[in-house]
Regions:
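Conserved long hydrophobic alpha-helices within structured protein cores
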Residues: 22-33, 84, 88-97, 242
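Active-site acidic/histidine proton-transfer and metal-coordination neighborhood
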Residues: 17, 51, 55-63, 73-173, ...
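Active-site beta-loop-alpha junctions enriched in small/polar residues
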Residues: 6-10, 33-35, 69-72, 110-114, ...
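Glycine-rich, proline-tolerant flexible connector loops at the mouths of alpha/beta enzymes
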Residues: 33-54, 111-113
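Residue-level marker of alpha-helix boundaries and capping positions
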Residues: 8-9, 44, 82, 122-123, ...
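Histidine-acidic metal/acid-base catalytic patches
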Residues: 1-4, 11-28, 51, 58-61, ...
Length: 280
């Protein structure tokens, strides 16, 4: 396994500064975020900037396991849905451009919606997910669906049902275990269910249970990263463990995105060592 970091927690940090900082800390890779409001927003990436970022990744010896393009697939507004689908498909095209040899970044997204809507919108979600996956499959790109607390897919069972209904090897899971930890689900339970279907991950720290919970920077809470890493390895996962800093943390008045990355690296790199898992 390798250690990565998502620029989700760095919306206003110039990409040059972000990549230099992450490489300097020792991260093995990065997930670049391309949604509106970020310095790497998809609509702002012209051909010159795309080429420049690819060269920056090479310069800093950073792998690109995933691109964060989180956009709802369940908007009832036709224009909004069209814009969301265009962004996701544009991210697929970007993944092809930013491929590193035969390593093509996955496209991470969340489904949108609310948990109680599952039965009502499942067929629509399958239809729209299938459209996206077919577009991605034609380009050899994998879509990584992320179960998310408060979203229509918020449990392992739901995301596994979606995978079965779409039935494509190009639809896998972006596994953020924090969304299950705050629901009181055990590490072994969720890892056993999802690791075999996972193409990319997110980790963060957390405190409390739904509805009284907060997401934290790795190292601020009590999440047992060593047990988690050992479980992921035991269930056959050998990809990236990527830190994601939540919007909840980013709203802090004293939030420092570079300091958050530093604490995250210290916490996770130590956990890899304590777990006896080499980063390779």
């Amino acid at each position: 396994m390798k250690l990565g970091y998502s620029t989700w927690g760095m919306p206003k940090v110039p990409v040059d500064e972000a990549l230099a900082h992450l490489a300097g800390l020792g991260f093995d890779g990065v997930e670049l975020t391309v949604i509106p409001g970020y310095t790497t927003e998809l609509s702002k990436l012209d051909a010159v900037e795309r080429s420049r970022i690819r060269q920056l990744l090479q310069k800093h010896h950073l792998m690109l396991p995933a691109i964060a393009a989180h956009s709802s697939l369940l908007s009832n507004d036709k224009e909004t849905h069209a814009a969301n689908m265009a962004r996701l498909k544009g991210a697929v095209d970007l993944a092809v451009e930013w491929a590193q040899g035969d390593i093509i970044p996955a496209i991470d997204t969340t489904p949108g919606g609310k948990p109680a809507e599952w039965d009502a919108v499942r067929d629509l979600l399958v239809e729209r997910t299938r459209e996206l996956v077919e577009y991605a499959q034609a380009r050899n790109v994998t879509i990584a669906m992320e179960p998310h607390v408060g979203a229509v897919i918020d449990t392992p069972e739901k995301v596994l049902q979606l995978l079965a209904l779409v039935d494509s090897p190009y639809l896998k899971v972006n596994f953020d275990i924090s969304h299950f930890n705050i629901q009181g689900l055990a590490i072994e339970e969720t890892v056993a269910a999802l690791a075999p279907h996972t193409v990319h991950t997110h980790v963060k720290d957390e405190r409390g249970l739904v509805p009284d919970f907060e997401f934290l920077i790795p190292g601020e809470g009590d999440f047992d990263y060593v047990t988690y890493l050992k479980a992921m390895q035991a269930h056959g996962y050998d990809g990236f463990i990527s830190v994601e800093i939540s919007i909840m943390v980013q709203r802090r008045p004293d939030y420092d995105p570079l300091a958050a990355a530093t604490l995250s690296y210290e916490t996770l790199s130590r956990a890899f060592i304590e777990a006896g898992i080499p980063r390779k």
